[in-house]
């Protein structure tokens, strides 16, 4: 596996780098948040949502839809799972960060061969949109031991409690939280906690590439 850049042409299938957003204040607030040895995710951080950029992203990027800005911080080098939402996700990175990405079009009966996963590095301070069709999960370190802090923008209430549903189609078995469809590798805590197991092949680890 090669680690590509979000500025490479290959990334256009997965997302785009957003230009024109002033995220200076957001990055300052993000720097104050925790960065554990594992991975922590908080869907909504009130301090982020008081900032001017909150309304700019809500109106300019999401066209006025209700949004939340939270964070995903920690240290990680593995794929473990992929997820998708019904909309784009914006990731604003404090430091160089790697994303392991797949495509919904590569799914076969909601299974995915991990050999189809690509790695892309986003530079510090960049704002990266991942399209709704991009399969993704926790960010990865770009340099061994450095960890990451990433502000995560999604429609309001995404990744909160799973709705109670009566299954009507195969995709329903993937629903893991609100607006979150999850596909796990068998060797993960998510699989142990009932996530649909559909990643086929090696659980990718980039520790020897960084």
Annotate each PLM feature.
Residues 1-124, 137-210:
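Active-site region of the double-stranded beta-helix
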Residues 124-127, 133:
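Tight coil/turn sites that cap or link beta-strands
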């Amino acid at each position: 596996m090669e680690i590509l850049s979000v500025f490479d042409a290959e990334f256009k299938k997965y997302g785009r780098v957003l230009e024109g957003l002033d995220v200076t204040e957001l990055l300052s607030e993000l720097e104050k948040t925790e960065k554990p040895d594992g991975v922590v995710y908080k869907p909504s951080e009130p301090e982020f949502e008081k900032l001017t950029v909150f309304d700019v992203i809500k109106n300019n990027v999401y066209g006025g839809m209700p949004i939340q800005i939270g964070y995903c911080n920690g240290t990680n080098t593995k794929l473990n799972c992929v997820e998708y939402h019904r909309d784009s996700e914006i990731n604003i990175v404090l430091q160089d960060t790697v994303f392991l990405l797949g495509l919904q079009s590569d799914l076969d009966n909601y299974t995915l061969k991990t050999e189809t996963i690509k790695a892309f590095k986003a530079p510090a301070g960049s704002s990266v949109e991942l399209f709704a069709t991009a399969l993704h999960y926790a960010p990865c370190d770009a340099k061994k031991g450095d960890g990451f802090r990433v502000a995560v923008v999604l429609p309001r209430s995404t990744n909160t409690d799973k709705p109670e549903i009566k299954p009507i189609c195969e995709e329903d078995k993937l629903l893991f939280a609100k607006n979150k469809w999850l596909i796990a590798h068998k060797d993960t805590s998510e699989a142990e906690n009932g996530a649909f197991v559909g990643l086929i092949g090696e659980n990718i680890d980039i520790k020897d590439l960084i």
